Regions:
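Intrinsically disordered, low-complexity N-terminal regions enriched in serine/proline/glycine
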Residues: 4, 52, 57, 74, ...
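N-terminal accessory alpha/beta regions
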Residues: 5, 13-145, 171, 184-185
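Active-site substrate-binding loop specific to GH73 endo-beta-N-acetylglucosaminidase modules
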Residues: 75-81, 96-99, 131-366
Length: 485
């Protein structure tokens, strides 16, 4: 049995695939190395996307607005051309298509599920065209490679990435006693600079400790001081899109006191530039509250909304035993799901629901691009945008979370009548993106069900009562068995 397990940790299996003889080993073996993307075309790099973003914001803010300040129509026309040549409306569709192509065709679907988890955990919310240029490549190049390192490594990479630093305004976090802070506050400009706590607060609240650690506002302030100086290099032609560099002239020197521990690194700014952040992150990433917080989030994603202490403890134990090695944490999560998950049902967020239906039913929504596609200076076609459009339709635009805590992975967030109606409508249109080589008759649906469900009787009965072609997709996709894994 254990067919349900394949949906709890991955996306289910297609009718052409074999059920693994040992599902737990099958899942755990996927975490030893980072798998390749299922995409043959060239993918943009972080640096390339920063350059494109820089060209976009500079041309729009500094050139077009001044050039056409008295002609709104001319401004919109030229801005539309700018969108085209920079790919402002192209790259989100590209990144989502890469994500889905890999999820559906990879030999490591459990790894892909875990990547999706971390992408949402270290979310970049909708701000400043980040979804258009940067969020997808940030998840590819910052999060994904670090999934075989330690949690400490992952947090540090995310915290010091251009995308996260820009997202949480750390360029505005300036030490008031730093060289630049003193200079800017001593001139006649009414605008004064100082600490910006955004990034520090999210690092403590969301990415490491959680509020259960009972840290104080003073801890947040001290963390913000540590993080001063981590900022992009300003460029008159790229504005805020310059590379990240620790800049001592903006840094508030210590000592600092965080969670009762004093960090006093002598001559830090001239000897070990920027390394104090790494030292503090090491302590935060290995704090007992962090281990419990992350373990609970993993259980909530893969097992159920209200995980037990026993579930959480099994992941924490692996974390402690392996010094935060993510490979072992991921494997422990798979074992926890195997041990506890089959007695619990987890309501699927919309994207997961879509991917599981696509995998099980063999939906063919990337059929026009068997080798992928790449940016060639044009707007995306309707086919390029298909994945993005479906995600918008079902209320889950992955790269556009409204808050830094990402999308809330709890049933109450997704069980509204409006969102259920959206899924019903989308499922009825699954008939338009089916595999042309498959006959989606009653027998096919029966094979899908028997391959993916340990208790198939109710779903088989529902499908036998669905006589209309389009109805089969809606009934299957929105059945309790498919909505919850």
């Amino acid at each position: 049995m254990n067919r349900d397990y394949l949906r709890k940790v991955a996306f289910g299996i297609s009718v052409d695939e074999s059920i693994p003889s040992d599902p737990l080993v099958w899942a755990q073996n996927q975490f030893d190395a980072v798998p390749d993307f299922i995409w043959e075309k060239k993918l943009p790099t972080l640096d390339e996307q920063r350059d494109r973003y820089g060209h976009w914001v500079y041309q729009d803010r500094e050139v077009l607005r001044e050039k056409h300040k008295n002609d709104r129509l001319a401004y919109e026309k030229e801005k539309d051309h700018l969108r085209k040549i920079t790919g402002e409306r192209f790259f989100e569709s590209l990144e989502l298509s890469v994500r889905h192509s890999t999820a559906l065709a990879s030999d490591s679907p459990a790894f892909e599920r875990m990547w999706h988890f971390w992408g949402n955990f270290f979310a970049i919310s909708e701000k400043d065209f980040l979804a258009s240029f940067s969020t997808g490549v940030y998840q590819r190049e910052v999060i994904r490679p670090n999934m075989v390192n330690t949690f400490e490594d992952l947090v540090y990479a995310v915290t010091t990435s251009w995308c996260m630093l820009h997202h949480l305004d750390n360029a505005e976090n300036i030490g008031p006693n730093s060289k630049e802070g003193v200079r800017e506050n001593s001139d006649n400009d009414k605008r004064k600079v100082g600490l910006n706590e955004n990034h520090a607060r999210e690092l403590l609240e969301l990415h490491t400790l959680s509020p259960e650690a009972n840290y104080t506002q003073e801890d947040v302030v001290e963390m913000a001081k540590v993080m001063t100086g981590w900022r992009h290099l300003w460029n008159n032609k790229k504005l805020e899109a310059g590379p990240i560099k620790f800049q001592t002239e903006y840094h508030e020197q210590g000592p600092y006191k965080i969670l009762g521990k004093v960090y006093d690194i002598k001559d830090f700014n001239t000897v070990n530039q920027g390394k104090e952040l790494k030292i503090v992150i090491k302590d935060l990433a290995n704090h007992p509250s962090t281990r419990k917080h992350i373990a609970k989030k993993l259980c909530q994603h893969f097992v159920c909304d209200e995980p037990t202490d026993e579930m959480i403890a099994s992941i924490v134990k692996a974390w402690e035993k392996n010094d935060g090695n993510l490979i072992e944490i991921h494997k422990a999560t798979m074992e926890t799901v195997f041990q506890y998950g089959l007695n619990h049902r987890k309501f699927s967020m919309p994207e997961l629901w879509l991917l599981q239906n696509a995998k099980m039913l063999g939906l063919f929504y990337l059929y026009m691009f068997p080798q992928g596609f790449e940016f060639k200076g044009s707007k995306p076609s309707r086919s390029h945008k298909l994945v993005k459009d479906i995600l918008w339709e079902i209320g889950h635009p992955i790269y556009r979370a409204k808050q830094p805590n990402g999308y809330i992975d709890l049933e109450d967030e997704w069980l509204s009548p409006e969102l259920i109606i959206r899924r019903l409508a989308a499922a009825r249109r699954f008939a338009d993106i089916t595999n042309p080589n498959v006959n989606y008759d009653q027998e096919y649906f029966e094979n899908v069900i028997l391959k993916n469900f340990d208790h198939p009787d109710n779903l088989l009965k529902l499908m036998k009562e669905s006589t209309f072609y389009a109805d089969r997709f809606a009934v299957f996709a929105n059945s309790p068995e498919v909505m919850r894994a």
